[in-house]
Amino acid sequence: MKLEEFLQQKYNYNPEIKDAIKGYIEQWKSWYKGNVRSFHNYFIYNGNKKVKQHRYTMNMAKEISEDWSDILWSEKCEISFVKEDSQKQFDKLIDELDLYSIINRALEKSGALGTTATVTSVYDILQNEDGMYLDVSQAKVRVDTVDVDWIYPLSWNNKEITECAFGSVEYVNGVKYVICSVHRLNEQNEYVIYNHLFKDSNGNLSEITEEQGTMKEFPTHSNIKWFSVFKPLLTNNLFNNSPFGIPHYANAIDNMKAVDISFDALKNEIKDGRKRTFVRSDMFNYDNGTQKMVFDPEDTTVYQLPSGATKDDLIQSDSDVLRTTQQIETLNTNLNILGSKVGFGENHYHFDGTNLSTATAVVSSNSKLFRRKKKLEIGYYNDILNLIKSVCYAATQFGTYNIDTTDMAIQFDDSIIEDKEAESVRASREVSQGLISKAEYRERIFGETEEAAKKAIEEIEEATPSVDKLLNNADSNDNSSNTDNKDEENNNKGEKDKDNKNDKNKKKDNKNKDLKEE
């Protein structure tokens, strides 16, 4: 029994959905590996027979997928939380899971094969027979990347895949097993994960129902998906209403062929640029002394002439000037066209005769690369957001973490696209001119949510009083000082008046005393 047959019988899976695009997926896998048998294997006729050749390749499908993954996600990207404690716990969790690497691989694989997925799970949970969780103190979260071959959509709409089955292969003591997890919504609109284990005998699967250590039915008690299906935000022009995506180069296959033909021609120009020898057919006979052939019949630089030529035509040779300059120019022209087709714009790739280089300069915000990057971020944002939410929920509900994902924000890295310092200066000017608020400034420059931005501004204003407040305090201090001075002046005046009165009374007493003596 095949896994598709099992899913069809038990979960009403429709195999036609994947069968329709399977041929393209196999083609994309070949290009991603850099070896398309129908293209990279060819023959050259040497005058006697066809000699098998293998075309040199620049493996641009891998290069394109890697470059887009690096542009979209790097260590400069930020995942931020409003609560400081949640941020600290999440930073610890992503280190344990190596989450940034998982996201980067998912972006590359989806860009290379059109679709890939991440699946979140937990293990080392102690559970009783009734399905109650007894101990989660040792529970660990795990995130697996699933290739398109093992993705089986069950329910989807124009926006997303809502129910899906995933397969994976594991070997135990040399025995091959297939593990299948099915994510479905129950009547309460909460996800339940059904796990199945199969023993694989040369492609024939037999389910193992008594396996210990695996929860056959795992209720998540949440509507958060424990899987994320990554697809580039490119319209699937091969199949309408398909849940599968297409790679970055899906509509540039002919351009990749042109690049490899040019590269192969350049390599052969150098390899075959030595003297080419034309030999009459009877010269290919065995040497009488050694019984070995005089010329190697597999050598493409030796061309066998038909018999009947004159004695002077037994062996001839020619040597031409190498045309490497023209070959390199042609190769770079094809690289420019390919780069433009896959969204990088012109001059993204350049071959200098030895190595392939990639443009690293900061590009204009109006460039094709910038616009394609922003478009892809729109689609990948929700995929990454759902992955993070599932990881945080699993670690909180079935582990020892406590992470609040409310108002969580993801900030992509735009340092290669735009000058952040210049953007900050421009945004500051807009704040001073009243064109945008301080909260809008923080949202744009720091990638914060509106709530987080307002909270940060409040904290800053509390720690740093405004100019008006400082002036008001200064006025209050001045008024207080003036009042104190006035009171002091009044007191001094009172004391002076009192002294003057005493002196006046004293003089009067002395005068009365003198009159009495007389």
Q: What is the meaning of each model-derived region?
A:
Residues 313, 426-518:
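Activation/maturation switch segments at domain boundaries
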Residues 318, 330, 337, 422-425, ...:
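Charged, long alpha-helical assembly modules
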